[in-house]
């Protein structure tokens, strides 16, 4: 698993000596929010209004963080409103690839070969790991978020007026308990 350094792909791997061989997940690099009216969310900038068909989700079926966004997409009836591309589950030297076979859909938006190219499209000088899930804004051609816990919170209520689905998986009275299961 490589990374982007100043917008250039590098095949450098995790330095596991610094972490005693443990995987340490980096903080997400894109933390904007989709809101019902397009106002800024808890982090990031404004301009991401909930609109049917405007957003795209990049996932891997091999990633549990991406998997939970797919579960929420289905539970909140967003399948017809947020399109999806599935990367190949095997991550090699170029990171997540957009192979097209029984395990992956390919990049249905831009026909990219690798997910890092989506990060470069969003931020040409990006530095950091290229991770899934990625919530993409097709209108502004940029990453809204790559933080799964925030993506599922957006999916929980932001599109309710569009879908009519008012199921609430993040009720105010239970949020502290929910954090035990949704925090990374």
Task: Put a short name on every predicted segment.
Residues 142-143, 161-169:
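Short, polar/flexible loop-turn hinges at active-site or ligand-entry regions and domain interfaces
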Residues 181-184:
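Conserved small/polar residues in nucleotide/adenosyl-binding loops
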Residues 47-90:
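Local sequence-structure signature of Cys/Sec-based thiol-disulfide redox active-site neighborhoods
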Residues 90-108:
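Charged, often glycine-rich, active-site loop that binds/positions anionic groups
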Residues 112-134:
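Structural micro-motif
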Residues 1-49, 53:
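N-terminal regions that are enriched for targeting/export leaders
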Residues 70, 76-78, 122-123, 139, ...:
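A generic secondary-structure signal for well-formed alpha-helical elements
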Residues 141-154:
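Non-catalytic, surface beta->alpha helical segment in thiol-disulfide oxidoreductase systems
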């Amino acid at each position: 698993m490589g990374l982007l350094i100043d917008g250039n792909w590098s095949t450098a791997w995790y330095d596991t000596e610094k972490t005693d061989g443990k995987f340490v997940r980096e903080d997400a690099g894109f933390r904007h929010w989709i809101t019902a009216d397009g106002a800024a969310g808890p982090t990031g900038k404004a301009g991401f209004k909930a609109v049917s068909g405007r957003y795209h989700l990049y996932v891997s079926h091999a990633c549990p963080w991406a998997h939970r966004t797919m579960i929420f997409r289905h539970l909140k009836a967003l399948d017809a409103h947020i399109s999806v591309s599935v990367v190949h589950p095997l991550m090699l030297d170029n990171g997540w690839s957009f192979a097209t076979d029984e395990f992956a859909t390919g990049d249905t938006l831009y026909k990219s070969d690798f997910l890092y190219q989506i990060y470069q499209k969003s931020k040409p000088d990006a530095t950091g790991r290229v991770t899934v899930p990625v919530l993409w804004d097709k209108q502004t051609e940029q990453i809204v978020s790559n933080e799964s816990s925030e993506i599922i919170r957006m999916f929980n209520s932001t599109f309710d007026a569009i879908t009519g689905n008012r199921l609430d998986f993040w009720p105010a009275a239970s949020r502290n308990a929910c954090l035990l299961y949704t925090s990374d």
